[in-house]
Curated annotation (Swiss-Prot):
Transmembrane segment boundaries: none
InterPro entries assigned to the protein according to its UniProt record, in alphabetical order: 4Fe4S-binding_SPASM_dom, Aldolase_TIM, Radical_SAM_PqqE_MftC-like, Spiro_SPASM
Pfam family for this entry, one: SPASM
Domain of life, source organism: Bacteria
Protein name (database record): Uncharacterized protein TP_0285
């Protein structure tokens, strides 16, 4: 089987027989995460746009053809439900806590959409959440099974860790074990954000007694997933002024338990939420937005906003239930080209998420 690292793997078998010299590139483009091999549709399109690239002209060509780095979406977020069981400090208040008060994406539309995603992108990670919690979606297992029919698609479940039935977790983990793929069949992110019930109460705006119960339930859920599917669970803490003092104990605790942790930067959603950032992590020089380059967000009614920051869909690119995905994707190209020219208007001018990167 062909391996993209076969040259290094071959040299490594007898590395002392080779004279290796490390060369530092005059222009650093590592942040662009370029991969010039054709193992996916996105990479093929990228290679096709740079057939004349060399070690001498790479910086000039990439700068001149930065528009070509936006190929097809690699990350989709399907809003199966708008409901979320907690009113966390980092969540817009416009999302309801009860599923009966929230819109649901029709299962038939979701499954049809998944088939079209597989045709358009071929390889992608599909998150089953935008701001809602997929545990509240009645047909979750059916949607996951539909996604895993396609070998190029993976599932990401972002959840509070509350309200999960053991049988559902067991079924999903069994589906994952039967559908091995890269980077994972099903990945899990659990929003914990605290190690103490007092901090959990503050971050998720619940009473102390509720916090004790919820934190215990979410912790047990995380450990259940880890026990059945090790290596694909990420406990997450949103780093904010409010919970900064628990960042280190959170990291140490969960690193020891499951081996991996996500420390997520706080997103004020372009000023919609108060600024609770502990520090400004943005690069010294701004570059085009990763999310405009590789993400597509789809709301329960099929509307496609410009990005996740477009909470109220005031910059809609189209409707995924009614229009071709390629056509919708092309409509985002103009805003991306503005970023290439260092023009950041409207939401983009207030955004602090452009340098963050999804799976």
């Amino acid at each position: 089987m062909f391996c993209t690292s076969f040259i290094f793997e071959s040299i490594k078998t007898d590395i002392n027989s080779f004279d290796l010299e490390t060369m530092i590139a005059p222009v650093d483009v590592r942040h662009l995460r370029l991969e010039f091999y054709t193992s996916s549709k996105a990479q093929f399109l990228q290679c096709a746009a740079f057939t004349d690239i060399t070690a001498e002209n790479y910086a000039q060509l990439i700068s001149a053809r930065e528009h070509a780095l936006r190929t097809v979406p690699a990350y989709y977020a399907l809003e199966l439900t708008r409901a979320y069981p907690l009113s966390s400090l980092y969540r817009p208040v416009s999302f309801p806590a009860q599923v009966e008060n929230a819109s649901l994406m029709p299962k038939e539309e979701a499954c049809a959409l998944i088939r079209r995603i597989a045709d358009f992108s071929e390889r992608a990670v599909i998150s089953l959440s935008v701001f809602g919690d997929p545990v509240l979606y009645p047909a979750l297992c059916d949607v996951v099974r539909e996604i895993l029919k396609y070998p190029g698609l993976s599932v990401l479940i972002e959840t509070s860790g509350l309200g999960w039935q053991e049988s559902v977790v067991r079924d999903l983990c069994e589906c994952a074990r039967n559908s091995a793929r890269t980077p994972f069949a099903i990945g899990w992110i659990v929003f914990l954000d605290a190690v103490s019930s007092g901090m959990y109460s503050q971050v998720h705006r619940v009473s102390l007694s509720e916090a004790e119960f919820f934190l215990k339930e979410a912790t047990e859920f995380a450990m259940q997933v880890h026990a059945q599917c090790p290596g694909v669970l990420w406990p997450q803490i949103f780093r904010m002024n409010e919970n900064e003092k628990e960042l280190e104990p959170f990291y140490r605790t969960w690193k020891e338990r499951v081996g991996q942790v996500i420390v997520q930067k706080y997103d004020h959603v372009c000023g919609l939420l108060p600024d609770r950032r502990v520090a400004d992590l943005s690069p010294l020089e701004r570059y085009p937005c990763w999310h405009l380059k590789r993400d597509m967000i789809i709301f329960t009614d099929g509307r496609v906003p410009l990005c996740k920051e477009d909470v109220h869909c005031r910059h809609a690119l189209g409707n995924a239930f009614q229009q071709d995905l390629a056509q919708i994707w092309r409509r985002g190209q103009d805003v991306y080209l503005q970023h290439v020219r260092a023009v950041h208007e409207g939401l983009c001018g207030q955004c602090d998420e452009y340098y963050t990167y999804n799976f």
